[in-house]
Amino acid sequence: MLKTDSLDFHSYLPPYRSLINPNARYDYRTHSLIPLTQNDLNLLRIAFQKKKEAPPSAFKMKYKSLLSDVSRTISMRLSNSNLLSSSSANNNNVLLSPPPSSSSTLSTPCGNILNRAGTTSSNISKINNLSQNQTQNQLPLFPAELHIKNLPVEILDYIFYLVDDNLDYKSCMYTCKLFYFLAKPYYYENLVFTSTYRFAQFVTYLRVNSEVGQYVQSIDLSGIKPGYDEDEQEEGQEENAENGEEENGGGARDPQYLLGEIADNPHHERVDQFPRGKILAGWRDWKFKNNPLYTIHPSPSLTKIASNSQFSNVSSKSSRSTSSKSSSSTTKKFVKPFRYFKSRKRKMSYSGTTKLERKSPRLEQLQLDQYSSNWNKRVNSHPLINKFLLHYSTSKDLPIGYILHMINLCPNIVSLNLGNLSLSTDYEISRSTIHKYQNFDLINNYPKDLIYKVDNIMRLNDVDDVYSIDGSILRFGNINSGSSGSNWERNGSSSNNRILFKSNQSIASTASSVYSVTTFSKPIRKYNSLLPPLPQTVADISYLNKGDGKVYLSDLNLKEINSAYLKKINEDEILSAIINVHGKRLIEYDTSLYQIPKPLNVDIAGTLKYINLSSMIWLNRKLIEKFLTRLLTKKSPELDMYGICYTDEFFDSDEQESDDDYEDSDDEEQRQCPIIYKQNLVIDFTDSGMYKSLPWAKRIDLNSFEGCQLANKIINNDLMTPQEQALRRERRRRGAIAANYLA
């Protein structure tokens, strides 16, 4: 028999040392990290230090080189756990026991290293004592562990504050629990949505996990675009035409190649009519995601095909109507369904006379210069519109219920931009019948253990390992904030990542939900036969307490229900929600500190600093008057006499004299009236209302005198057209007829 020599892979593979965890080595046999004890590290340090301090003579170095290589011995010890464990044990015996004999020292691997540092056994004990004294005086070779987790939380928060990039915050959320905990508040701080689909996902997630709304401080919905934007598609079509003429010399594309692209897209029936063939999904696609009437059913099984003879007839008719190769291949597949269960026969003859025709592969060109790699397409992909909802492709409306959810669940908003927003009619479900529709809620689009996973990530303690990246960590997709937007759909490549956002609602349950509530199949309780089920009232109460406690028709995957359970919501409910969450608060002022005999009430403003309600055709003067009256705070004149409210130089004397309305007024209180509305708030009503150039449809800056003056006129219903204002000035200039006659 041939005898094979064992290969020493240590001569080819260097000892692995990790920069993250230097106290561990990598074993190439077991493919695992093995920690090094402090005794092993001290032993290696002594060997290296003694080699540098006492260089032997040339004869000894030559003699040692004949025996073995010191560097190779050290590398072998770093890669062999048995040698390190034995050397550390023997090192402890040497330090604690009396000096052994030379023969016993040479019999162990530790003795071999120490024997090279000295020639006699007495010198070994001296070297050990000397090395112990030196290690106490010198700094350790491997200092204490330095990691970002050892920094205070305030410093870590300031570091993440300086990042100021949404994509970087998203990458930090994929790193570890500590980074997820620190980056999450900054990631949701400023949100800018461009897709109604992403905003619908965000609102549903707010109802599932309301704590996320505490982080939001700015929301911008003014950039919402439809799924099919004609201007953008025309620009992209012109760019593609120019690029095609430059690359292909003005030649046309292969029709077979176009057929291949259409066959890959399940919604190719009407997509090919649009330029570039790309229509993004809207909020209705998220609403009817689990509704079987709006979803694409999978292909039927082979047993059903074999039992149903009509299917082959239908397929044969469809094959006669189409002449493409893809349709003919599908008909051949369904003509003989049991062909796949038989063993395949070899058709190639062994005589060698027949020659197989080899098809030439399709040539493809790599576009390395463009930012369109497969990874980016997978991560930044936006779902396309359903073919049953193509007539909504040019609409960019949002239901009123989503806006109300956002306002109620985000109490810390500082900037709210709803400019150019188109609203669609929505209905609120009566509270007495909400529990009947909880199985059809869009909350079921997310897994039931979503809150548990998020809470587990956000719960940091000493047991958590911040170094590891758990594969089961909840990974959100792209959130379209700014250019990236809000993506709540998982786009991971692994199957575990895809399962996380898989709907828990079965096909049978969704099918029954379309017809009636009473036919809904009861869930099968596995392994819970010994435990009593929870009462229905407990489940109903927990469902009613989710989110803001309100459910709208847009929150269900049903198109319509009984109108007796519905209540129509008007657009003015948005103004009422803003007032309830961010309106002024009336509190009693503590008068004991200022020795005031009677209690005083003071208005406290909310957190809002900017509201954009421009281009809202449903707004009118009465709604604006009511909105400003309940939103704006006033400086109490009763506190001025006690010196509690400070008085600023709100406007210059020139500005005050230039205003004719307040200049000609004899009442000093009327002249100073706009000052009481001064606050850090900007409200934009530009181009709102049914008509153009309305006197109240302007930008109101309450930090300026003009803004406070306009707000005062709106509240007091004192708005006039320019002609009426000119007539009023002329009357004041002339005065009364009797007064001029007597003068």
Curated annotation (Swiss-Prot):
Question: Which residues lie in Acidic residues bias regions?
Answer: 229-248
- Region annotated Disordered sits at 224-257, 311-330
UniProt keyword Transmembrane present: no
Q: Which top-level group of life is the source organism from? A: Eukaryota
Alphabetical UniProt keywords: Ubl conjugation pathway
Signal peptide range equals: none
Give the residues annotated as coiled coil: none
Question: Which InterPro entries does this entry report, sorted A to Z?
Answer: F-box-like_dom_sf
SUPFAM superfamilies, per this entry?
F-box domain (SSF81383)
**Domain F-box per the UniProt entry, residue ranges:** 145-191
**Reported function:** F-box protein probably involved in ubiquitin conjugation pathway.
Official protein name in the record:
F-box protein COS111
